[in-house]
């Protein structure tokens, strides 16, 4: 579970950046 969170963190960050780009 911990590893999944670590992997999802950058993914969510990237999505946040994409949304900000819109």
Curated annotation (Swiss-Prot):
GO terms for cellular component: extracellular region. Expressed by the skin dorsal glands. One of its GO terms (biological process) is defense response. Keywords: Amidation, Amphibian defense peptide, Secreted. The modification Leucine amide is found at residue 22. It is found in: Secreted. Lacks antimicrobial activity. Does not inhibit the formation of NO by neuronal nitric oxide. Belongs to the frog skin active peptide (FSAP) family. Rothein subfamily. This is Rothein 2.2. It comes from Litoria rothii (Roth's tree frog). The lineage of its organism: Eukaryota, Metazoa, Chordata, Craniata, Vertebrata.
């Amino acid at each position: 579970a911990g590893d999944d969170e670590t992997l999802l963190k950058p993914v969510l960050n990237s999505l946040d950046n994409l949304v900000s780009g819109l």
